């Protein structure tokens, strides 16, 4: 991530996972949509109640396995609910914040079909900014899942109070790995997720770039060559990613 390019805002479609793993969308105040028939239909039972960041994940057959967010506008720490709309064991009061822009990101563990990593980012406004990850094992609780590890602090914990609300992922050049990316000030932190787990970070410093406001979004182009950072108050920038 070396070159800073001035550019207009572009929206990229992030094709990280197979199509059916995004067949359920859980968002907002108890809202959910099922895309399995090709036409979005309401899904009932959501316990989610959030104005901003949230996440949901389905299996390769398009069946919901869990979703992530907050149960109310007051309780901003994250909860992970299973497909029965019940909190997972160890899945209540997690690090992160439902008021952060990108809040939670799920990445399937390569080579371990029942393991998922959930990456979370907090928010400065509630004094819980930072970057962490948790591990979910879907073989637990009769297939409904359990949060078996975490929180693991990522980035530089000494700078967590100034961490941004941005996190994204893209498939690596080798098909059985992913890159997970977040940022702080003038630095981008990239973590390779492969069969060995979550690797140590690779840090890139961008001269002349700084995030004044933590809010915004990170996205990677589908070919994995460009990273776009849309920042509140400090514009939108595109970088080479390799």
Regions found by a protein language model. Name each.
Residues 1-24:
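Bacterial Sec-dependent N-terminal signal peptides
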Residues 6, 10, 61, 138, ...:
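Residue-level marker of positions within ordered structural domains that often coincide
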Residues 24-28, 58, 65-69, 112-124, ...:
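Hydrophobic core segments of beta-strands in well-ordered, beta-rich domains
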Residues 123-183, 194, 205-209:
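Asp-box/WD-like beta-propeller blade repeats and closely related beta-sheet repeat scaffolds
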Residues 19, 49-63, 95-114, 157-177, ...:
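Structural signature of eukaryotic scaffold interfaces centered on beta-propeller domains
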Residues 19-101, 107-111, 120-147, 173-242:
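Beta-propeller domains
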């Amino acid at each position: 991530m070396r070159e800073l390019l001035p550019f207009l805002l572009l929206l990229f479609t992030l094709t990280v996972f197979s199509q059916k793993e995004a067949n359920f969308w859980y968002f907002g105040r108890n809202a959910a949509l099922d895309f399995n028939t090709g036409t979005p239909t309401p899904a009932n039972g959501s316990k989610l109640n959030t104005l901003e960041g949230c996440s949901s994940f389905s299996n390769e057959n398009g069946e919901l396995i869990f979703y992530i967010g907050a149960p109310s506008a007051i309780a901003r720490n994250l909860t992970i609910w299973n497909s029965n709309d019940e909190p997972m064991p160890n899945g209540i009061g997690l690090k992160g914040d439902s008021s952060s822009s990108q809040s939670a990101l799920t990445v399937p563990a390569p080579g371990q079909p029942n393991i998922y990593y959930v990456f979370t980012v907090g928010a400065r406004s509630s004094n819980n900014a930072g970057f962490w990850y948790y591990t979910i094992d879907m073989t637990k609780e009769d297939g409904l899942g359990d949060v078996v590890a975490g929180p693991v602090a990522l980035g530089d914990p000494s700078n967590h109070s100034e961490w941004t609300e941005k996190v994204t992922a893209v498939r690596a050049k080798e098909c059985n790995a992913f890159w997970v990316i977040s940022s702080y000030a003038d630095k981008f932190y990239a973590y390779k997720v492969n069969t060995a787990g979550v690797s140590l970070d690779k840090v890139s410093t961008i001269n002349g770039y700084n995030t004044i406001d933590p809010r915004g979004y990170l996205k990677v182009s589908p070919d994995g060559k460009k990273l776009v950072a849309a920042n509140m108050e400090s514009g939108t920038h595109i970088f080479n990613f390799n």
